[in-house]
From Swiss-Prot:
Entry's pH dependence statement: Optimum pH is 7.7.
Known outcome of mutating P558G: Decreased metalloendopeptidase activity without effect on protein stability
The gene coding this protein: PITRM1
Cofactor(s) listed: Zn(2+)
UniProt keyword Disulfide bond, yes or no: yes
Active site positions: E107, E180
Protein name: Presequence protease, mitochondrial
Entry similarity comment: Belongs to the peptidase M16 family. PreP subfamily.
Keyword Nucleotide-binding appears in the UniProt entry: no
Cofactor binding summary note: Binds 1 zinc ion per subunit.
Length: 1037
């Protein structure tokens, strides 16, 4: 996977927070792993390594142990923490000097087989032989990273063995280079009369990556700002340069870069360090001697005067104003990222300058009305040896470029003169405190990503983690010098000659020109071929296709057994209490480390149909327009000072036992430090009772930003949009899902953003509020520590008593609704007093008839996103478990080969969603009709039963790695709260998964997937297609 450096440019605040994944077993009452690690001493010799440093980092609840390998100089960092989700990564400094994508293609190819594991594609095969919680690889601008995580010690050793052998002893076969990188091959490999074309997984991945205008801008920004060395090229590969790479160059790059002396090893979690060191030394490092790698990235020579560049990109078919598609940014080179305190300071300074409606650049640029959103890579970017800061606007008219530049200069001058309000600095430091306390499930992955760039350039990763020290030093600097931050702005922005102004405008013929350049390159390559070369290409194509089609013997790979899977799920204890009369509140006591997580779910059943499309917009702006006596700026300030965020999002929740029944509503989510709980609940009270819908100008700004973000997200999420549309007509919930989250919503937001008079839309918001922001049809959930619960119950009760209730009961808009009690989650009524359980009010459509719809969304992309959906059965039906295993089996044993290896798409597969929709999909795919045919062949393959018990067991392991993914303390009990799933229901489903057999898989593949057995929906996002255009059964949009 390629990481465009600029796209990862998040400040320290976001890089350590870790998202909303799941976690399973946290034991914060014990710090055994940390205490064990503190027993190591400086100079200790362990399995060929020497301990260099042992440091406690209490703010992150971990102990850091730094080591060096004696014979090779390989560096090692172990972060001991009482977290069962253990992670390993190995990182190499990879510094390409051209845009052939050599580090990226190498990252793909090393995972295709190694000396100890010579079978083809051990990486993808291990996905099905492991209970890993994460497995992947990333190519950044100047390093390549190979991480995995798992909760199982035996699994950790298995995966470590595969990763070590892959990275240090790969086969690097020529056919694997052809498949993963690029090749010349006949359009139909078995027919030498068909034309020769470029193929390859990375080739197509990068063609897809550069359909994204933000990516194009980010890449050029880095290339132009840092032009002297490796940052001047595209590490992932420019599709027009990739065909210049040879197999010999690939092998040479591995020999010079993938050596222990150029490696950094990282482990995290509660598994013992000694076992890791022993295995790494014995299986890999003992076979090498130290070398001096010549991979150091030199400092960029500073400029003596600013520079300007103009570039072009493809048109945005979702632009709210076709005459406003220009992007401009001004960027400044900053100091070396290994100066950790300066990097920390500039990261915070960046947030003060650009984050939220109170920031100077938001006021000057976003609220100017000149553009739709900040330019890509806005803020601090610390992923290159020297960091950079960038700010600008996208969605502007070309004539406004100079205006934006002068606004940026003027804003810098104003900040130098006036500085920042104390409250904004406090809000920022409060945010860091929250993110140090918030426990994510993928914390090891967050940490390895956070330290990767600094460590890559020989900075001290442990110093980077000591956020407490840096915060204290930051406060001290501010105290000693109130103009500390203003002086930094003056030094790095006002007086900095290393300043780049980059502008990008659309060219209607951009993709056409790219295609012409590719065609010219192809023509040159083909014309240079001798008859012998052509014959060899044809034979190699047949050989590759033959190899891809052969059954693979993966017996050399280590594997867990189904018996290694835990037979039962851990019990989650919940209390449900009726509060303020009849509102159920679910309390889940968890080790949340002084944090409180509050959520509320409010039904949309009484909302008139014509208002439903506007619910996502309502949710997006609800916490951003002001409330009570607070205007939107004051509200933003209070939210940052008192909470870790407050948000609302529309949800369509399937019923667990009926396909035509669902729940519709809005989920309100928030988190805070326990000391701020009354303030957070008071903010919710004001938002519910007195939201402000009068700020027309700010509403316009928010609408434009939302529309721009949706349009920008299509290239990365095209397969999801295709799948949502394909499932639209299969269930009643599918249509609502399309309205809330599909291409319909993208297009609606585009239309709203284009409106000259936005008042009619603004007037809809109070109407939605009447149906949504009250105590009718609401339920709440709280996750906090047991000690916090009494205070929490009082604050939640005060909030619920403060919000309005309808004077008379509103009737649901849909005539058929059913009240469904949610079963208690921990057996019987032990934790749920009689009459206190959650009642879900579901919408039922008894007369619904699914029907087939085929949609082709025309997009100016050179690749496609394909989705086919099939209606099957709900969660509690025993067949649901069999279909879940079947989807994994079809992906691993058939679709991966057909769609990725043979077809050249970046990704593809099958999945069964909780709502009973079975989806076949592809991602960044050069094909359409051929992919749909592959979906059909996959069904035929499943019905033929050509899979073994070993295949079924591997599919079960893969499914259970998802089912048993870790759940964070903040998210425990959410399945029960949102979906009504009790522990007993989940255990029953677990037993159904264990019981899936060959016969059951054959039965469900025939019963649901065969032609004419169930209703199918199809959708494609991509360029024009003559075959589809001629087929009247397709709707083209």
């Amino acid at each position: 996977m390629w990481r465009c450096g600029g796209r990862q440019g998040l400040c320290v605040l976001r890089r350590l927070s870790g998202g909303h994944a799941h976690h399973r077993a946290w034991r914060w009452n014990s710090n055994r792993a940390c205490e064990r690690a503190l027993q190591y001493k400086l100079g200790d010799k362990i399995h060929g390594f020497t301990v260099n440093q042992v440091t406690s980092v209490p703010e992150l609840f971990l102990t850091a142990v730094k080591l060096t390998h004696d014979d090779t100089g390989a560096r090692y960092l172990h972060l001991a923490r009482e977290d069962t989700n253990n992670l390993f990564s190995v990182q190499f400094r990879t510094t390409p000097m051209d845009s052939t994508g050599v580090p990226h293609i190498l990252e793909h190819t090393v995972l295709c087989g190694s000396q100890k594991y010579p079978c083809r594609d051990p990486f993808f095969k291990m996905l099905n032989r492991s209970l890993s919680t994460f497995m992947n690889a990333f190519t950044a601008s100047d390093y390549t990273l190979y991480p995995f995580s798992t909760q199982n010690p035996k699994d950790f050793q298995n995966l470590l063995s595969v990763y070590l052998d892959a990275t240090f002893f790969p086969c690097l076969r020529e056919l694997d280079f052809w498949q993963e990188g690029w090749r010349l091959e006949h359009e139909n490999p078995s027919d030498p009369q068909t034309p020769l074309v470029f193929k390859g997984v990375v080739f197509n991945e990068m063609k897809g990556a550069f359909t994204d205008n933000e990516r194009i801008f980010s890449q050029h920004l880095q290339n132009r700002l840092l032009p002297d060395h490796t940052y001047s090229v595209v590490s992932g590969g420019d599709p027009l340069c990739i065909p210049e790479l040879t197999w010999e160059q690939l092998k040479q790059f591995h020999a010079t870069h993938y050596h222990p002396s150029n490696a950094r090893f990282f482990t995290y979690g509660n598994f013992p360090l000694e076992q890791h060191l022993k295995q790494i030394h014995e299986e890999a490092l003992s076979k090498f001697q130290k070398i001096e790698p010549s991979t150091v990235v030199p400092a960029q020579t500073p400029w003596d005067k600013p520079r300007e560049f103009q570039i072009t990109c493809g048109p945005d078919s979702f632009a709210t104003d076709p005459s406003k598609q220009t992007t401009i940014s001004v960027s400044f080179l900053l100091p070396d990222i290994t100066d950790t305190f300066e990097a920390f300071t500039l990261s915070l300074l960046s947030s003060l300058l650009t984050s939220g409606p109170n920031s100077p650049f938001y006021k000057a640029l976003i609220e100017s009305g000149l553009g739709t959103d900040f330019s890509p890579d806005v803020g601090y970017n610390g992923y290159t040896r020297e960091a950079y800061f960038s700010v600008g606007l996208q969605g502007i008219a070309e004539k406004d470029i100079e205006t934006v530049r002068s606004l940026i200069d003027r804003t810098i001058d104003e900040v130098v003169e006036k500085g920042f309000e104390d409250d904004r600095i406090e809000a920022l430091l409060h945010k860091i405190e929250i993110q140090m306390k918030h426990q994510s499930t993928s914390f090891g992955l967050m940490l390895t990503s956070y330290i990767a760039s600094c460590w890559n350039h020989d900075g001290d990763p442990v110093e980077l983690l000591k956020l407490g020290n840096q915060l204290a030093k930051f406060r001290q600097c501010l105290q000693e010098n109130p103009k500390f931050l203003q002086e930094k702005v003056k030094q790095y922005f006002k007086n900095n000659q290393h300043k780049l102004t980059l502008s990008m405008r659309p060219d209607d013929k951009y993709h056409e020109k790219q295609a012409q350049v590719e065609a010219t390159k192809l023509k040159q390559k083909v014309e240079a071929l001798s008859p012998g070369d052509r014959q060899q290409i044809y034979e190699k194509g047949l050989e590759l296709r033959s190899q891809q089609s052969k059954p693979q013997d993966a017996s050399c790979l280590p594997a867990l057994k189904v018996s290694d899977i835990e037979p039962t799920i851990p019990v989650t204890e919940l209390d449900v209490v009726l509060t303020a009369g009849d509102i159920p509140v679910q309390y889940c006591a968890q080790p949340t480390n002084g944090m409180v997580y509050f959520r509320a779910f409010s039904s949309l059943n009484t909302l008139p149909e014509e208002l439903r499309p506007y619910v996502p917009l309502f949710c997006s702006v609800l916490t951003k327009l002001g409330c009570g006596l607070l205007d939107y700026r004051e509200q933003a300030q209070q939210i940052e000072l008192k909470t870790g965020g407050m948000s609302a999002s529309p949800h369509v929740l399937p019923d667990d036992s009926h396909m035509d029944t669902y729940e519709q509503g809005v989920l309100f989510s928030s988190l805070c430090l326990d000391r701020n709980l009354p303030d957070m609940m008071q903010l919710w009270s004001e938002i519910f009772n007195n939201p402000c819908f009068e700020e027309e100008e700010h509403f316009k700004v928010l609408v434009k930003m939302t529309a721009q973000e949706l349009a920008n997200g299509i290239p990365d999420s095209g397969h999801l949009y295709a799948s949502i549309r394909a499932g639209r007509t299969l269930t009643p919930a599918g249509d609502l899902q399309e309205t809330f989250s599909g291409m319909d919503q993208v297009r609606l937001m585009k239309r709203i953003a284009e409106m000259t008079d936005i008042k009619p839309i603004l007037r809809k918001l109070p109407r939605i509020k009447k149906h949504l922001l009250n105590g009718d049809n609401m339920r709440c959930s709280v996750n906090a520590t047991p000690q916090q619960m009494p205070q929490t119950e009082k604050a939640v009760e005060d909030f619920l008593r403060s919000i309005g209730r309808s004077k008379k009961e509103r009737r649901p808009v849909r005539p058929h609704t059913v009240e469904k009690p949610v079963p208690s989650s921990s057996g019987g009524d032990a934790h749920v007093p009689h009459g206190s359980q959650v009642i879900r009010k579901l919408v039922m459509e008894p007369t619904f008839k699914p029907w087939q719809m085929k949609t082709h969304f025309l997009m100016p992309f050179p690749v496609n996103y394909v989705g086919e959906c099939i209606r099957t059965v709900p969660y509690t039906d025993p067949d649901h478990a069999s279909l879940k295993i079947l989807a994994r089996l079809m992906t691993a044993k058939f679709l991966h080969t057909e769609i990725r290896e043979k077809g050249g798409a970046y990704g593809g597969g099958a999945k069964l969603s909780h709502n009973g929709i079975f989806t076949l999909y592809s991602y960044r795919d050069p094909n359409t009709i051929e992919t749909l045919q592959s979906f059909g062949k996959a069904v035929d393959w499943a019905k033929s039963g050509k899979f073994t018990q070993q295949d079924i067991d591997e599919a079960k392991l893969s499914v259970f790695s998802t089912v048993d993914a870790p759940v964070a303390p903040s998210d425990k009990g959410m399945d029960h709260f949102l979906y009504g799933l009790s522990d007993e229901m989940k255990q029953a489903h677990r037993e159904q998964l264990f019981a899936v057999s060959h016969d059951k898989l054959l039965a469900v593949s025939d019963r649901y997937l065969g032609t004419g057995k169930s209703t199918h929906g199809l959708a494609i996002l991509g360029p024009e297609n003559p075959k589809i255009a001629k087929d009247p059964s397709w709707i083209i949009q």
